[in-house]
Amino acid sequence: MTQQIDRYAVFGNPIEHSKSPFIHTLFARQTNQPLIYTAETAPKEGFVEAVKAFFAEGGKGCNVTLPFKEEAYQFASRLTERAQLAGAVNTLKKLDDGDIIGDNTDGAGLVQDLLQHQVVLAGARILVIGAGGAARGVLKPLLDQKPTSLTITNRTFSKAEKLAVLFAAYGSVTAKEMNTVTEEYDVIINSTSASLSGELPALSSSIFAANSTSYDMMYGKGDTTFNQWAKQHGAAHAYDGLGMLVGQAAESFMLWRGLRPGSKQILRELRKNLEGL
């Protein structure tokens, strides 16, 4: 009797650049899970139809990336608490009763990566730069680690303020205008995509405390623009978002398959793939 091979995918537009098939294929091999995972381009105006067709044809679960995370949030018939708070969904799973549950594993992936690097979050002073979907998705998991304070700063201050109000019940959260952020922080997280265009947020370089950690959610070959700047101005450690990508994927895999794959070896393989080694 042939073993059934379950289908998973990632939906986005564009999607050619996605590392998710590479990651999940390695996860499947590592855990001996019979599955295939593909990258699927959904039309900008046809995400829901594409995902419905995928599940109707027997798909078990999928990841969702830009620009469809908010649409996936609306599409899901049930939501996890962290997806509700994130206001966006990056993981969908078809349940036995036919319902589709939506989850957001981004924040768990970030925290997992930071802890893997021995970054102490409990009692830390955390600065999050940016107030878009990427920031919103990680705030609750960061606050769950019990930092002393979490400050959100953003070019448009009102967006940072909205997030601070939304998450006030979960810890000490404040919003600050970029030009007023001058104190030192232990963990500085850049959730903006500025590094992709070689730009930097308009922030003072005095934000890096002794032994501080800089974390840029973007990644590429070598240090990102933000991490180069952070190291020049006193950050003791600097990490990019590749580990977060692997961490959120491991969390999605756990939701789908009920077991957590190891991330370290996969991250090494992915880094080699990215550097073209």
From Swiss-Prot:
Record's InterPro entries?
Aminoacid_DH-like_N_sf, NAD(P)-bd_dom_sf, SDH_C, Shikimate_DH, Shikimate_DH-bd_N, Shikimate_DH_fam, Shikm_DH/Glu-tRNA_Rdtase
The entry marks the following residues as binding NADP(+), namely: E81, G130, A131, G132, G133, A134, N154, R155, T156, F157, S158, K159, M217, G241
Lineage, top-rank taxon, reads Bacteria
Q: Which residues form the signal peptide?
A: none
Write out the GO MF terms.
NADP binding; shikimate 3-dehydrogenase (NADP+) activity
Q: Which reaction does it catalyse?
A: shikimate + NADP(+) = 3-dehydroshikimate + NADPH + H(+)
Q: A single GO CC term, please? A: cytosol
Q: In which pathway does it act?
A: Metabolic intermediate biosynthesis; chorismate biosynthesis; chorismate from D-erythrose 4-phosphate and phosphoenolpyruvate: step 4/7
For this UniProt record, the keywords arranged alphabetically read as follows: Amino-acid biosynthesis, Aromatic amino acid biosynthesis, NADP, Oxidoreductase
Task: Enumerate the residues binding shikimate.
Answer: S18, K19, S20, T65, N90, D106, Y219
Reported EC number(s) for this entry are: 1.1.1.25
Identify which top EC class this enzyme belongs to: oxidoreductase
Pfam families tied to this protein: SDH_C, Shikimate_DH, Shikimate_dh_N
Which residues does the Swiss-Prot or TrEMBL record annotate as the active site? K69 (proton acceptor)
Give one GO biological process term.
Answer: chorismate biosynthetic process
- Entry annotated with the keyword Lyase: no
Question: Which NCBIfam families did the record assign?
Answer: aroE (TIGR00507), PRK00258.1-2 (NF001310)
| Assembly and oligomerization | Homodimer.
Family note: Belongs to the shikimate dehydrogenase family.
What exactly does this protein do? Involved in the biosynthesis of the chorismate, which leads to the biosynthesis of aromatic amino acids. Catalyzes the reversible NADPH linked reduction of 3-dehydroshikimate (DHSA) to yield shikimate (SA).
For this entry, the protein name equals Shikimate dehydrogenase (NADP(+))
